[in-house]
Amino acid sequence: MKPTADMIIIGGGIHGASLAFHLAQRGVKVLLLEKSYLAAGATGRSSGLVRMHYDLELESRLAWESFQYFRDWRERVGGDCGFRRTGFIYIAPPEQTEALKANIQMHQRI
């Protein structure tokens, strides 16, 4: 019998590799095609920042989920992905104070 796949994914960057991983976890037979090597394109040249501060609640919720995934990588996937929790500082002009306070309240709800 010829080998088959339920899903063929073209591109082994972060999106393609993540999709392949999650589909395979759900029992889907996946074939991932990459013309060079995994993370050869923009993914491999990325600074790898997992940003947490967004203006929209949906984006902030997605960022929180992503953060937890990278933080718990070893337990979820196995091995070390190189994630290191660091910090971030934003020096805002005074006219942004109220907007930033509202943003902080939104983040605290998440």
Give the role of each language-model region.
Residues I8, S36, H53:
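Anionic group-transfer/hydrolysis microenvironments
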Residues A24-G44:
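Glycine-rich FAD pyrophosphate-binding loop
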Residues G48-I110:
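Dinucleotide-binding Rossmann-like beta1-alpha1 core, especially the glycine-rich loop
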Residues M1-H15, L31:
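Beta1/beta-strand and adjacent pyrophosphate-binding region of the FAD-binding site
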Residues M1-K2, A24, F83:
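Short, flexible hinge/linker loops that cap or flank conserved catalytic cores
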Residues K2-T4, G41-R45, V50:
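Accessory recognition modules or surfaces
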